[in-house]
């Protein structure tokens, strides 16, 4: 066993061996993306399964909801993380707890993985980190669910802050399910970068690039398709290249925000935040949560669960023999 090998949970390995669907999950959302204290009123507003966990800190409640939602949708969850320098696909309950309560968890982006292994560090994977672990962990892991991908930051002209989520997705043959790019990013620049990198962008039930907490406004058109069609397009994509496929859906209607309102609040938040680098996005999302009186956080949690369910459907579709005889 080499230092850089990936430990895959036995449950995940047996599901893959039996051709049962598996959904990969990132964990920076747990370590960096959400409040680490309980917000019982907020979680109760969302109803079950969040309401039953309203006593838990938000980040831990979400971690459990994601795994349970995948299971209820007929797939096996494989949460990725770096635990004491080990690359892990499929956390135990104890590891999930350790990760959520770790006092100095690192954001496990691709450029940090080797240092984290060498220093035996612990941290939550970004989309780019999760894609790397899933692809190295087992070639049949084909689906990752997240909230919103990283991309090109607002103000990129002054500081070219571009997430490795994009470059890693461009060379890793997985489906990544999201609600578009995080709202704190430049959606147009991110959309253009996806095209430049040769990453197909599909919409399940939507015709324009969703804006994370809000649906798209029609300005960034994407190919609208059903989950079986999306799985077939992904299969076709991997016959002609190694780029991943970005599969988007709008946030669920009762919780979605209106784009105009969201944009106004986001611009205020962006102006108020000075953090840069890996701390930028968590700080911006925190400011947005406050400025929107918690509505952005409600939408964020709802769309995360929504994406876990779609990812489970896609993981099952991917296994249908129909998609292999192209």
Predicted regions and their residues:
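N- or domain-start disorder-to-order transition segments that initiate the globular core
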Residues: 2-19
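Short coil/turn connectors at secondary-structure junctions
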Residues: 17-21, 25, 72-77, 111-113, ...
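Glycine-rich nucleotide/cofactor/substrate-binding loop typically near the N-terminus or early
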Residues: 27, 32, 40, 44-116, ...
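Short, ordered loop/turn segments at secondary-structure junctions
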Residues: 27-30, 82-85, 148-151, 179-182, ...
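Divalent-metal (Mg2+/Mn2+/Ca2+)-assisted nucleotide/phosphate chemistry catalytic cores
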Residues: 90-173
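Active-site glycine-rich loop that binds ribose-phosphate moieties when present
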Residues: 124-127, 156-170, 175-195, 226-232
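Anionic-ligand binding region
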Residues: 213-238
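A C-terminal functional module that forms or caps the active site or interfaces directly
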Residues: 237, 243-306
């Amino acid at each position: 066993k080499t230092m850089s090998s990936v430990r895959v949970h036995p449950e995940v390995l047996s599901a893959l061996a039996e051709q049962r669907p598996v959904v990969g999950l990132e964990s920076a959302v747990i370590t960096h993306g959400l409040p680490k204290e309980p917000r019982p009123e907020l979680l109760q507003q969302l109803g079950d399964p969040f309401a039953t966990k309203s006593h838990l800190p938000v980040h831990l409640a979400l971690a459990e909801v994601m795994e349970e939602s995948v299971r209820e949708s007929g797939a096996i969850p494989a949460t990725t993380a770096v635990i004491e320098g080990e690359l892990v696909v499929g956390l135990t309950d104890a590891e999930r707890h350790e990760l959520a309560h770790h006092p100095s968890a690192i954001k496990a982006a691709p450029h940090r993985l080797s240092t984290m292994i060498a220093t035996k560090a612990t941290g939550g994977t970004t989309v780019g980190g999760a894609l790397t672990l899933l692809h190295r962990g087992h070639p049949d892991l084909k689906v990752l669910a997240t909230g919103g991908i990283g991309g090109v930051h607002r103000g990129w002209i002054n500081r070219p802050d571009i997430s490795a989520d994009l470059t890693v997705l461009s060379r890793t043959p997985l489906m990544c399910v999201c609600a578009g790019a995080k709202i704190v990013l430049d959606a147009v620049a991110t959309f253009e970068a996806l095209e430049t990198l040769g990453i197909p962008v599909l919409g399940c039930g939507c015709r324009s690039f969703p804006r994370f907490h809000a649906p798209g406004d029609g300005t960034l058109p994407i190919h609208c398709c059903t989950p079986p069609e999306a799985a077939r397009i992904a299969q076709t994509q991997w016959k002609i290249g190694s780029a991943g496929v970005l599969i988007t859906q709008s946030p669920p209607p009762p919780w979605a925000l209106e784009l105009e309102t969201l944009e106004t609040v986001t611009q205020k938040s962006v102006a108020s935040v000075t953090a840069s680098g890996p701390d930028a996005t968590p700080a911006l999302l925190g400011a947005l949560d406050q400025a929107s009186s918690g509505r952005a956080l409600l939408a964020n949690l709802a769309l995360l669960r929504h994406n876990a369910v779609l990812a489970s459907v896609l993981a099952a579709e991917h296994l249908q023999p129909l998609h292999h005889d192209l």
